[in-house]
């Protein structure tokens, strides 16, 4: 950003969330970092791609927001995976458990979308484990630089590493549940 600014131009970092579905539907969440005036100039272009467009702050803050997003998504996927695995191993029907949870405080987009993938065993990639693993690596490297402990993020990164080590890096990140299933010697559901 600094080099571009020195040349007399503006720089915006603008990572997105919403995956392939959001891109096709022009409903991406766009997290922008950079100067206000530059943001306002290009906002009409962002509006062609997304619905939730936020100028988070200065240069780099868009990327920081994206990494924070990836932390939340990873931890929620792990939580849904653990909950459904626990329920299934205890003998409950994971589909009915998910249905019940969707009506309460535990309801979330992750439970809705990725919980269903875990139950139906549909791990076709929307966002690949390998890419999410890279993002968590950025989070952990940034945390080290900042002197911040992110123990839950480190745990989720380890689960993704287990998946990658077992050839699952190209599956959807909801397949993180497979690492939990390997440790429990139990699958949430049968295909």
Annotated model-derived regions:
Residues 93-102, 154-158:
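Beta-strand segments within the central parallel beta-sheet cores of soluble alpha/beta enzyme folds
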Residues 59, 63, 107-174:
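Interdomain hinge/lid region at the active-site interface
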Residues 25-33, 54, 58-90, 101-113, ...:
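Active-site-proximal catalytic alpha-helix in oxidoreductases
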Residues 1-74:
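Rossmann-fold dinucleotide-binding core
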Residues 171-191:
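Short, basic/aromatic-enriched C-terminal tail that caps enzymatic domains
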């Amino acid at each position: 950003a600094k080099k571009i600014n020195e040349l007399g131009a503006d720089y915006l970092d603008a990572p997105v969330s919403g995956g392939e579905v959001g891109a096709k539907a022009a409903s991406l969440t766009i997290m922008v970092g950079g100067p206000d005036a530059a943001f306002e100039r290009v906002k009409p272009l962002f509006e062609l791609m997304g619905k939730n467009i936020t100028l988070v702050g200065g240069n780099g803050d868009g990327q920081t927001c994206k990494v924070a997003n990836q932390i939340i998504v990873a931890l929620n996927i792990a939580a849904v995976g653990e909950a459904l695995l626990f329920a299934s191993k205890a003998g409950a029907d994971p589909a009915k458990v998910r249905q019940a949870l969707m009506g309460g405080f535990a309801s979330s987009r992750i439970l809705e979308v990725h919980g269903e993938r875990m139950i139906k065993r549909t791990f076709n990639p929307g966002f690949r484990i390998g890419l999410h693993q890279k993002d968590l690596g950025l989070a952990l490297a940034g945390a080290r630089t900042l002197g911040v402990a992110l123990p839950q993020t480190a745990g989720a990164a380890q689960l993704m590493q287990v998946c990658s080590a077992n050839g699952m890096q190209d599956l959807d990140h909801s397949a993180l549940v497979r690492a939990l299933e390997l440790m429990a010697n139990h699958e949430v559901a049968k295909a």
